[in-house]
């Protein structure tokens, strides 16, 4: 809390957003050493004014990659920290609900790196319910056994990484819902659209250019949500996915903006959410 107060009070407002903090760790980045030095100088002056001391031996300056919180961060990418993958790599078949919850806790921290994580993990979450008996013995080939091995394989895939979001480029979000749950992908493109293109969202609609994935999200439907009509689930899926990506959307430059894609054509018409009960309150 002391770090947050100090930075909010003593850092210049135009560079406050350049600093990230978690517990007692601070990090910032720049494209040039000169710019990085100016940020470092501002931070030292900020801590001095706040009366906060830091240990010089713990300072890293001018490096191309750092470990921060649960991640390894570079200029372009963010990937899971190797120390966080060790418990998953060493995890054997769970023999109790406690062990299963520990496994899910480790993997949930990195769910944004995996497509459909929330839907794949649904059989495992079901086993953590009070009224659901834990399988003894653990049976191979069951839905929960397949889910356990799929998640473990996904998490330990060495190619897992996410692109760092560029707030000056347009953000794209693809949302979809199925019978099992909803999911979304936030991504950007490396190249700018052609000069004079007014609607980048329409221009990129059928683009075959490589996408730079910024984050994945997914979640299985609850028993109640599974009973809702398809139109309701599609609308609810979009709403909840946008809520999950709210921070990504709100940190976009005003000129860059964001575009949301859905394959549910009926909901794209004007007034499609009117006069449909609770859907009217979800109208965006």
Segments predicted by a language model, with ranges:
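A short, polar/acidic, helix/strand-boundary loop motif
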Residues: 1-2, 192-236, 264-268, 272-274
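C-terminal reverse transcriptase regions that engage the nucleic-acid substrate
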Residues: 17, 22, 60-163, 168
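RNase H catalytic domain
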Residues: 239-284
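Inter-domain linker/hinge segments that demarcate the starts of reverse transcriptase
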Residues: 2-12, 34-55, 85-96, 135-167, ...
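Active-site palm subdomain of RNA-directed nucleic acid polymerases
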Residues: 1-40, 47, 113-117, 205-206, ...
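Mobile genetic element proteins and their domesticated derivatives, centered on retroelements
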Residues: 7, 23-26, 47, 54, ...
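Catalytic palm subdomain of template-directed nucleic-acid polymerases
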Residues: 12-50, 67-79, 88-89, 189, ...
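Beta-sheet entry/capping signal
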Residues: 18-20, 25, 51-53, 58-60, ...
């Amino acid at each position: 809390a002391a770090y947050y107060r100090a930075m909010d009070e003593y850092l210049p407002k135009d560079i406050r957003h350049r600093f990230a903090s978690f517990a007692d760790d601070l990090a910032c980045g720049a494209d040039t050493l000169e710019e990085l030095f100016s940020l470092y100088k501002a931070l030292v002056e900020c801590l001095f004014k706040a009366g906060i001391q830091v240990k010089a031996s713990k300072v890293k300056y001018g490096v191309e990659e750092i470990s921060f919180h649960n991640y390894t961060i570079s200029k372009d990418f963010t990937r899971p920290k190797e120390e966080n993958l060790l418990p998953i790599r060493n995890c054997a078949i769970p023999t109790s609900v406690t062990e299963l919850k520990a496994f899910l806790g480790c993997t949930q921290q990195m769910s944004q790196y995996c497509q459909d994580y929330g839907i794949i993990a649904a059989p495992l979450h079901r086993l953590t319910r009070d009224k659901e008996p834990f399988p003894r013995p653990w049976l191979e080939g069951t839905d929960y056994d397949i889910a356990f091995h799929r998640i473990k394989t996904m998490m330990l895939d060495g190619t897992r990484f996410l692109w760092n979001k560029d707030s000056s480029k347009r953000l794209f979000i693809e949302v979809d819902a199925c019978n099992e749950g909803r999911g979304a992908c936030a991504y950007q493109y490396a190249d700018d659209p052609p000069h004079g293109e007014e609607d980048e969202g329409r221009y990129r609609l059928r683009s075959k250019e490589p996408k730079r994935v910024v984050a994945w999200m997914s979640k299985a439907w609850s028993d109640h949500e599974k009973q809702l009509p398809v139109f309701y689930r599609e609308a609810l899926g979009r709403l909840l996915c946008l809520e999950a990506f709210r921070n990504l959307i709100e940190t976009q430059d005003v000129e860059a903006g964001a575009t949301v894609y859905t394959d549910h054509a009926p909901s794209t018409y004007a007034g499609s959410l009117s006069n449909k009960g609770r859907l009217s309150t979800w109208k965006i």
